[in-house]
């Protein structure tokens, strides 16, 4: 039977999007969200959180289905939640954000940073990384969670419009005071992470990405394609027991070593942050903090992860805005 690889890759991506990704998180509870909008230049996080904790900020309920900010403006959200009394055993509990992510490049998009009430950073949020930890899989709570399971998180949301490259735009001078893009608030949920389901999604992501970059004259190309097809045929979202079978179908091709003459590559995390590109310079300063906070979150998960940031100015901005991660890690 002729295997049409490009068609199967497209099919696999659809399976990932529609039949795997929706099952990665199991929603346990919803949060209460209040917001205050600043259409102009942002306030330093430490100053804002100090005012918020002391009751000097009037947060208003955030409407579902409505834009939550204005172009180049900042919206602060106060997220209140309560962990359920009984949590799924052996599963990480996370706060999952849907701030209205749209299908375009991450750099020109809404972004956010989550803080504890003491002003320390938890991690950043963007369309491809929209969660933060509450309880680890082995039951260790983040210090944002109180002994009774309640928590308050302060989220600095940047309402950045999508500025197209190399074209004339009206969005490049200053905040406009209006929502030029409709990023509609959807939800902030307490959810249990299914690590096996996420790992299956990651396996399929690696396989599809490899097939898109391999030469079809390589025998391994066809072995990967056939294993991918077999795997997604086995996965039935209505029968969780098929997950193990679907992953097993990928085992052999995922663990085969490269040929003897292949180069050995060592991968390293590196942030390419444009200092002055499609956003204000002050937004670059905030992007540096968000990027580093997520790199640190990865280091907490995997001590072998190595991260590089090459611009000295970015380190200076980081120390100015977020001295805590610079000094303690």
Regions found by a protein language model. Name each.
Residues 1-329:
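Carbohydrate-active enzymes and regulators
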